[in-house]
Amino acid sequence: MSVKRNALRVAATTVASGLLAAGALATAGSASAATYPVYGFHTLDNAHDFTFNQLLGINDEGVIAGYFGSGMAVGHPNKGYVLLPPYGQGRYVNENFPGSVQTQVTGLNNRGVTVGFWSDTNKGSGDANFAWVNVGGQFRSADFPTGDDASPVVDQLLGVNDEDLAVGFWTDANGNNHGYSFNALTGQFRSVVDPGDAGLSLSANAINDRGDVAGAYTTAAGTTDGFLLTHRGQFIDLAVPGASSTMALGVNNRDEVVGTYTVGSGGSAQNHGFTWTPQHGFRSLDEPQGQGTTIINGVNDFGQLVGFYVDATGNTDGFLATPQG
């Protein structure tokens, strides 16, 4: 079972379809780059499996959502956790959907609500994914109601805000992703779409307290771009210049977006992390030990980042990046 992050204020009524393009990429030493903070990086791996950890979300108290175990081979299931500060092996708290074989904790808010997805098998490939939300220690299934699911089922919640509004996606029988939101208080589902083209494949990956949603979608040209859909209905395309794909995976209340972009293809492809703000555009940012293998998944309102990278030995390591000064 693997994170589908390849692949809003949810549109209860008609959403304006203003499409804007994001700014250029800032590189080290440029004038734009000078406006960004310097980060201190820390690798954080659960001792239950030092070979595979992914950190996927962080709240303003510094609590981190993640999991260990690749899920890519029988006997190595995904196992979810939250990691509490100050970070150490004794600060990992297991969190797994009741009765599940595999669980990923993909997002959390400042109220302690967590979201993710689970599976009832660990076959290495072809495991079904089912969405869940945990409010006050009570787990609840949250699969989007549809009669057109892929086989096996793919349904994942990936982020949640302080209004307990979660976002994610499900995959249809043709392999297309459909973004949606789930209100953990009312149980209401709503579709999340690109207002300019509701038919495109799209995943909603994160949501802030204003209802601004970050995600990824397939463009009319067939490429994967990130997006920020504001609560006012403005759809901002996020595409790193020169990248073969861009995915927005996290957003905070200042509309700082984080994610990953790919340069090249096939065996030569490299993944780089990025941050983006409306004021300064893109900045490329890799974990120092993971140049070309970095994914940034989450950001809190203090600008702390979490994600993962592949190190020189081939292990997947979680990391925390904290602005300095």
What are these regions (language model features)?
Residues S2, N6-V10, T14, L25, ...:
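Residue-level hotspots at or immediately adjacent to binding/recognition sites across diverse folds
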Residues L19-L25:
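Hydrophobic alpha-helical membrane-insertion segments, chiefly the h-region
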